[in-house]
């Protein structure tokens, strides 16, 4: 469009065929027992977690890496919050 206001002369309509409507729902069905078997065989995700804490004797920084699942790292966190402490190699 050129000018300050649009006019009918500036508008061009391009009429094409209307696209065909396609049903996207699939009627394919799976055997549920096969899906359940595959799900049960997968192991829980294991990930590496970095743990930074202090030595209970000299209060120096101690860093370690553990590999475990999400539930296990939460359990480890609870142990640190309760009575579990780490001793650095120098204080052992």
Swiss-Prot record:
GO terms for biological process: DNA-templated transcription; symbiont-mediated perturbation of host cell cycle G1/S transition checkpoint; symbiont-mediated suppression of host innate immune response; symbiont-mediated suppression of host type I interferon-mediated signaling pathway. It comes from Human papillomavirus 57. The E7 terminal domain is an intrinsically disordered domain, whose flexibility and conformational transitions confer target adaptability to the oncoprotein. It allows adaptation to a variety of protein targets and exposes the PEST degradation sequence that regulates its turnover in the cell. Homodimer. Homooligomer. Interacts with host RB1; this interaction induces dissociation of RB1-E2F1 complex thereby disrupting RB1 activity. Interacts with host EP300; this interaction represses EP300 transcriptional activity. Interacts with protein E2; this interaction inhibits E7 oncogenic activity. Interacts with host TMEM173/STING; this interaction impairs the ability of TMEM173/STING to sense cytosolic DNA and promote the production of type I interferon (IFN-alpha and IFN-beta). Gene3D superfamilies: 3.30.160.330. This is Protein E7. InterPro entries: Papilloma_E7. It comes from the Viruses. GO terms for cellular component: host cell cytoplasm; host cell nucleus. Keywords: Activator, DNA-binding, Early protein, G1/S host cell cycle checkpoint dysregulation by virus, Host cytoplasm, Host nucleus, Host-virus interaction, Inhibition of host innate immune response by virus, Inhibition of host interferon signaling pathway by virus, Interferon antiviral system evasion, Metal-binding, Modulation of host cell cycle by virus, Oncogene, Transcription, Transcription regulation, Viral immunoevasion, Zinc, Zinc-finger. A zinc finger (unnamed) spans 55-91.
